[in-house]
Design a protein with these regions (language model features):
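Extracytoplasmic cell-surface/polysaccharide-interacting catalytic and binding patches
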Residues: 1-128, 214, 219-226
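Polar/charged alpha-helical tracts
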Residues: 6, 10, 112, 127, ...
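Generic secondary-structure microfeatures
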Residues: 111, 136-138, 151, 170-172
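A structural signal for short, well-ordered beta-strand segments and their strand-loop junctions
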Residues: 116-119, 129-135, 198-199, 209-211
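Acidic helix-start/capping segments at beta-turn-to-alpha-helix junctions
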Residues: 125-145
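Charged, often glycine-rich, active-site loop that binds/positions anionic groups
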Residues: 141-158
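Catalytic cores and adjacent binding grooves of peptidoglycan-active enzymes
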Residues: 157-166, 170-226
Length: 226
C-alpha cells in the first residue's frame, strides 16, 4: 500500500505541519504547496455558514488539490455549459477528497508499481509514471439535465451528484480489468467497501465507473457493455 507520509512533502514542509491546523474539514484541500483552504478559512467565531468559501467553476480550481495527484478542477470538469458552472457544494468536495485520498491515489500507485515501472524505479520521482485520467467526477443537477437534453440517460440519484463517483479512462479492456482487480484488493486489504465498480464500454471505448460513499456502500460490481 501507498505510504502517504512519503508524498506529504509535496504539500507540507514536514509531516508535523499536518497537525498544526485542524480548523475544519477542508484542511486537506490545498491552495498551494504549504497552505490549505482550512488554514485560510479558520476562525474562532461560530457562524451558520462556518466561514466556508464558495466553490467556483472547475477551471479556477485546477490548482486546488484534493490529494497529491488530483485537483478539484479535474474532478469537476464538464463539456456542458450551465449557470452553476458545475460547482460542487461543500459536502461534495469533502466526498471527492475521500475518494481521491483513500482510493484513487492507491489505484494510481499500485497500477504503476505493478504494471508500469521497473523494480529499480522510484514511484515518487520517476518520469515513467502513468497518470490516472478522470473523464468525469462531480455532476451537478444542471449538468444532469443537460445530459438528458443531449439524449443520454443519467440517473437523478447518481453518486456523481454527491461527489462520490468518478469515471476513469481506460486504454482498453485489459487495463480496465487490472484497475478493477486493484480496487477490489484495496477494499479487501483496508476492510473498507466501495459502492459501485462498473466496467463500461460504448463501442470500442472503455472506462471504469467507481463510487465510494461515506457510509452504506453496497459493493456492486457489474459489466455494462454496449
Amino acid at each position: 500500500m501507498l505510504d502517504k507520509t512519503k508524498y506529504l512533502s509535496e504539500h507540507l514542509a514536514s509531516p508535523n505541519e499536518a497537525a498544526l491546523s485542524h480548523s475544519n474539514k477542508f484542511d486537506g484541500l490545498h491552495l498551494s504547496p504549504h497552505f490549505s483552504l482550512g488554514e485560510l478559512t479558520k476562525t474562532s467565531f461560530k457562524t451558520e455558514d462556518n466561514n466556508e468559501a464558495s466553490v467556483c467553476r472547475s477551471s479556477k480550481f485546477d490548482g486546488f488539490r484534493l490529494s497529491p495527484h488530483f485537483t478539484l478542477g479535474e474532478l469537476t470538469k464538464t463539456s456542458y455549459k450551465t449557470d452553476d458552472n458545475n460547482e460542487p457544494p461543500l459536502e461534495a468536495v469533502e466526498n471527492l477528497i475521500h475518494l481521491c485520498d483513500d482510493w484513487l491515489e492507491e489505484l494510481r500507485y499500485l497500477y504503476n508499481v505493478l504494471y508500469v515501472l521497473r523494480p529499480s524505479d522510484d514511484y515518487f520521482t520517476s518520469k515513467e509514471v502513468e497518470p490516472l485520467v478522470i473523464n468525469q467526477g462531480f455532476r451537478s443537477y444542471q449538468v444532469m439535465l443537460k445530459m438528458k437534453e443531449a439524449g443520454l440517460n443519467p440517473s437523478e440519484t447518481s453518486n456523481h451528484m454527491r461527489g462520490c463517483a468518478v469515471d476513469i479512462r481506460c486504454a482498453g479492456k485489459e487495463q480496465a480489468i487490472r484497475f478493477m482487480n486493484i480496487l477490489i484488493d484495496i477494499a479487501d486489504q483496508k476492510e473498507q467497501d466501495f459502492d459501485e465498480l462498473f466496467l463500461e464500454r460504448r463501442g470500442t471505448v472503455y472506462w471504469l465507473h467507481f463510487a465510494a460513499r461515506p457510509k452504506d456502500n453496497r459493493r456492486k460490481i457489474d459489466f455494462i457493455l454496449k
